[in-house]
């Protein structure tokens, strides 16, 4: 392997280093590209209006990706960035944010498969800065997301979904989800609701999966988010095995503050979603009773 560093030099030196990187990339089996923000781009009084990768790094990435499409990107960042081009031209992205003193060792172990990435995104990554703010628990509008007309919630030049959504993350195996099972179809105040689902590891390697439970209150006296994360469990599943993941919800999980700022329970229909991330669509319904 060969290591190349320090591309943020004067223009002439930068061009020479990029040309050298291209020559090496042409012969390489795989390119590991470490890119991202400067450490000073984050922290107190470090807001940005431009969430692109720095221009110098974009030049390097475009030049290398033009001669080698087997790129693994390691991303150092303080915030969600515009990764459209990086995502399209990378076989994988390992988002490490800004790790501590043992970060380098952990990154190497993950890249070589000695350990597996198990993290999940705590924020959405937009497709462009024009999509901001973008978050999974937005409020619904009077225009649906999909409809056979132009009067919908969305954009004419981009999908409405973020590039990477809240709760997303991959590892070195694959999981399949079964059907959601609820222990009751009607919930009264003072009772609990148990929701369960079977998760199977369909890969050839043991792994951990973070199973996430979201709810949606369809009808309420105030507008409620399209999804709310209420529970999650990180479970180990051996290759080829299936585990049953169970969640217990209490009445407080369905309460909210009304317009009088009272913490209330309102009868109505609740959808229970369980899946890999906030984009999950499979659900079962429970009715909140008087």
Which residues fall in each region the model found?
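Domain-level signal for soluble alpha/beta catalytic cores
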Residues: 21, 193, 203, 220-222
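Secreted, periplasmic, or luminal enzymes acting at the cell surface/secretory milieu
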Residues: 1-9, 76-208, 214, 234, ...
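Terminal connector regions
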Residues: 250-290
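Hydrophobic helix-and-loop "lid/oligomerization" segment in the mid-to-C-terminal part
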Residues: 2-88
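Short, contiguous acidic/charged loop-to-helix segments that flank catalytic cores in large enzymes
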Residues: 45-55, 59, 95-99, 185-187, ...
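Intrinsically disordered, low-complexity Pro/Gly/Ser/Thr-rich segments with frequent PxxP/GP/PP motifs
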Residues: 221-257
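Short acidic, flexible loop segments centered on an aromatic residue
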Residues: 204-221, 227-229
């Amino acid at each position: 392997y060969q290591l190349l560093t320090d591309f943020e030099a004067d223009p002439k030196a930068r061009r020479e280093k990029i040309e050298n990187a291209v020559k090496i990339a042409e012969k390489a089996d795989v390119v590991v590209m470490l890119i991202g923000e400067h450490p000073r781009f984050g922290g107190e009084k470090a807001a940005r209006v431009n969430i692109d990768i720095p221009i110098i790094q974009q030049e390097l990435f475009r030049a290398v990706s033009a001669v080698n499409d087997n790129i693994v990107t390691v991303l150092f960042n303080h915030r969600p960035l515009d990764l459209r081009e990086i995502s399209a031209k990378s076989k994988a992205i390992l988002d490490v944010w800004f790790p501590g003193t043992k970060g380098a060792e952990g990154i190497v172990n993950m890249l070589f498969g000695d350990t597996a990435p198990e993290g999940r995104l705590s924020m959405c990554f937009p497709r462009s800065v024009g999509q901001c703010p973008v978050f999974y628990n937005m409020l619904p509008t009077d225009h649906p997301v999909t409809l056979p007309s132009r009067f919908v919630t969305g954009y004419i030049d981009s999908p409405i979904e973020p590039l990477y959504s809240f709760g997303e993350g991959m590892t070195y195996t694959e999981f399949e989800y079964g059907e959601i099972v609820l222990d009751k179809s009607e919930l009264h105040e003072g009772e609990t609701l148990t929701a369960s689902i079977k998760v199977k590891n369909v890969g050839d390697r043991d792994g951990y999966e973070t199973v996430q439970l979201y709810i949606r209150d369809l009808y309420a006296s105030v507008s409620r988010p399209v999804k709310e994360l209420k529970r999650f469990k990180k479970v180990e599943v051996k290759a080829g095995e299936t585990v049953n993941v169970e969640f217990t919800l209490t009445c407080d999980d369905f309460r909210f503050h009304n317009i009088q700022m009272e913490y209330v329970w309102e009868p109505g229909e609740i959808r229970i979603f369980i899946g890999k991330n906030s984009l999950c669509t499979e659900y079962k319904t429970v009715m909140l009773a008087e």
